[in-house]
Amino acid sequence: MAEVELKRAGAIAYRESVSEGEPSGPPVLLAHGFPESSRMWTTVMAALAADGRRSLAPDLFCLGDSSDPGPATFERNLEALTAFHRELGLGRVALVVHDWGGFIGLAWASENPDLVEALVISDTGFFSDGKWHGMAEMMRSEQGEAVIGSLDRDGFGGLLHLDGAGFTEDDVDAYWRPFEHGRGRQATLEFFRSMDFSKLAPYEGKLGELGVPTLLLWGAEDKFAPLGGAYRFKQEIPGAQLLAIEGAGHFVFAQEPERCAAAVASFLGGHG
């Protein structure tokens, strides 16, 4: 397996994997979701490196190893992704997104259509009439502080396994760290409360206008971002391909890491 290195660009920590020799295509930029970090992409990044691709995965604010005293809102994470791409001089990229990373990454893609070579969209939403799931609604409510404040490591592990198994104990420890020692708890409230689906209205129709190859990779049993959302993306994006992983839930990259990595590498190898 190719080595995936943890690096830093200012306040943003990120993982990078580079193959030996000349890259075989544009860089791959990966945006993770809640409550994970760039760690979720390590198997995918190794598969991409084996195919000769450079890949980079930043940590969202206050998740993983990124640290910032400011609020971890949708807007600030979008600004951070934009700055990260610019400062590293990535140019055109293939973009891979999951969960929260979908809101942030797809907004970035919509605002920067000339910089997008291909898309892989996984278990997320990007529609202005979307609805939050029950856990998110609780975080957005006045109960949020009490709920997130009472969370311990065991409860956090239970949260990760609400939608199927797949995480190792090392995974749980790694993803729990910002909640135990950092601003992970407050960042959770800040992002959920800042992310009103109505904010996506300016992006309506933009993904379909990109005209780039798109793979929709979904856990067929996802309870947080159900498979129906994938079919809606398929209607909105001409030519989009759908791969639904049977038996997998929301955290499909943890539950089927090798299969997902192979699917992403194969798709981008042929299209981006």
Which residues does each PLM region occupy?
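Flexible "cap/lid" loop of the alpha/beta hydrolase fold
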Residues: 110, 118-148
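Conserved HGGG/HGGXW glycine-rich cap/lid loop of the alpha/beta-hydrolase fold
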Residues: 18-65
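Active-site loop/oxyanion-hole signature of alpha/beta-hydrolase fold enzymes
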Residues: 50, 57-97, 262
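Catalytic active-site module of serine/aspartate enzymes centered on a nucleophile-bearing elbow/loop
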Residues: 240-272
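Acidic catalytic loop of the alpha/beta-hydrolase fold
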Residues: 221-225
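Conserved alpha/beta-hydrolase catalytic His-Asp/Glu region
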Residues: 150-208
